[in-house]
């Protein structure tokens, strides 16, 4: 059992995910104390904020994105994977990107695939203690899927609207997206 299964399987732990599909996937696996909770704000607090015209010019935009683009472990995993595994994982991610409202990652990553990856890792480095489990690999693919989706959306929005990105990472490669830090 991996750490995430221990955490989610503990009946004392209540977990709230802002990602509805991820929360449902965990519930489908039998973790009954995982719930979807959209990110919220205190609207009344923001109603009272008054900006100068200089601040409005600096921070105002038609679209603002605040947050991480999920720089996860996918590049590190694919770097040491077989060409077949890389191609399969890319195909799975690209398929998931096309299926809004459906979640396939947990169904298309099976035990044999994970075992084959672990066997390959062991062949590369016989002394390695690195072992992937299905939940960890699916999580890595979830993050990469979200990252690619956010990159696509930011590129699209930046090409059509005044768009600002607030993130710790530097993404100055986007055309039409102003990185605000």
Regions found by a protein language model. Give the residues of each.
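A conserved, positively charged/aromatic
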Residues: 4-15
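Nucleotide-sugar donor-binding catalytic core of glycosyltransferases
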Residues: 29-181
